[in-house]
């Protein structure tokens, strides 16, 4: 096994750890889930570039008669990228004391101001940061509003 194979294994393990944390661990942290709302994806171009470059590496490894283990590892890396960028749906998860947005825990008391833009984007102003929450279904904004009013 070469150094390249070890680096690819490291990347696969890192992506797998992130996927397990996002799917199974994060919803169980900081209390029960009150509401989980699917969000719009930001951009699939980054994922397309990642999977495309990995496909080029797979092709190059096959045509240059590289080791089969490297081909399999690159294929696993491409599948992890496919899952993370296309299959997994980003969510905002509301808990009794706060919420997870982009895998970051934010307590309700940090919210200074909330606005709704014309195009249906919920804007939350924190102390030093502005969150732009783009929900997949516009009716979910009403659920978020009712939850925030009931918990505040």
From Swiss-Prot:
Membrane topology: Multi-pass membrane protein
Gene Ontology CC, one term: plasma membrane
Keyword hit for Cell membrane: yes
Domain of life (superkingdom): Bacteria
Localization per Swiss-Prot or TrEMBL: Cell inner membrane
Record-annotated membrane-spanning stretches: 6-26, 45-65, 67-87
Keyword Methyltransferase on entry: no
Chief localization: membrane
Annotated family: Belongs to the UPF0266 family.
Protein name (record): UPF0266 membrane protein KPK_1957
